[in-house]
């Protein structure tokens, strides 16, 4: 009985990762499952985040459901990291292992077929099996979009209309440089797990104008929960005179942690790019 059970599981696993191909000359060759790297853009407004949830209302759930329809068995995807409910992405990256004997372009078309309009795979490529969407990433770039005027109905999902019309952008531009470098960012996180490493490095931090709105751009090797939104909220507090640059510098030294910071809403946050 145990021998049969072992053979059953052995051939089940084997069939999942190895398939039979016939080449142009009619000769057979063995084909191992390949690792596929995918880039995806999504509007996170209606999703409860990236990571799979019990109610299946996460971006990961939608993509895995599409993969099940293609391969007729469950395929787990591994993302570069999580995004929270309401957060968007232009360049989220994930990978999965599956047998696919056609061109990557055909897989791209198959993935996008019947996906909801809010999710679109923008690139598919075969990669070495040592690649990992999360652990191979060197840095991630986030953009936070905000403006000083009310948003019209066609942009309200993707930008924060800051409720302070007299916000001094020059103060934000002066304060944002405080965040560059290696710091303990626990004072700029929503919540921190007991054993979590709160020391992170931001290689660039800046604010620039794009048409009629402004963009906070952060590039770094790692982020804490709600870290970008907390930084954005702190900058707005500087811009309206509630705190000053010295306050941010002291908080990065883990002083005045008892003082609550504003958390910017999720709608303006985009995962722009994952760098490998």
Residue ranges of each PLM-predicted region?
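Short terminal hydrophobic/aromatic SLiMs and anchors at protein ends
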Residues: 3, 11-14, 24
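Short linear motifs in intrinsically disordered
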Residues: 9-10, 18
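Structured-RNA-binding interfaces characteristic of tRNA pseudouridine synthases
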Residues: 17, 28-276
């Amino acid at each position: 009985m145990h021998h049969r059970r072992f053979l059953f599981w052995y051939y089940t696993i084997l069939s999942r990762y190895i398939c039979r191909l016939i080449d142009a000359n009619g000769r057979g060759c063995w084909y191992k499952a390949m690792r596929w790297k995918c880039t995806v853009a999504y509007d996170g407004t209606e999703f409860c985040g990236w990571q799979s949830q019990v109610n299946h209302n996460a971006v990961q759930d939608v993509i895995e459901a599409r993969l099940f329809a293609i391969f007729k068995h469950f395929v787990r995807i591994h993302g570069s990291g999580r995004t929270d409910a309401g957060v968007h992405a232009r360049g989220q990256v994930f990978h999965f292992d599956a047998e696919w004997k056609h061109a990557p372009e055909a897989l791209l078309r198959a993935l996008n077929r019947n996906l909801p309009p809010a999710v679109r795979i923008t690139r598919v490529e075969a990669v070495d099996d040592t690649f990992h969407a999360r652990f191979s990433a060197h840095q991630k770039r986030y953009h936070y979009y905000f403006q000083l005027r009310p948003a019209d109905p066609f942009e309200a999902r993707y930008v924060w209309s800051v409720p302070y019309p007299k916000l001094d952008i020059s103060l934000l531009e002066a304060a944002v440089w405080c965040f560059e470098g290696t710091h303990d960012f626990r004072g700029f996180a929503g919540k921190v797990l007991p054993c979590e490493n709160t020391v992170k490095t931001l290689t660039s931090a800046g604010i620039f104008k794009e048409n009629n709105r402004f963009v906070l751009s952060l590039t770094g090797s790692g982020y804490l929960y709600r870290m970008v939104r907390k930084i954005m909220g702190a900058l707005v507090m500087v811009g309206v005179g509630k705190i000053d640059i010295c306050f941010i510098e002291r908080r990065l030294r883990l002083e005045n942690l008892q003082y609550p910071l504003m958390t910017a809403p999720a709608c303006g946050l985009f995962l722009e790019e994952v760098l490998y």
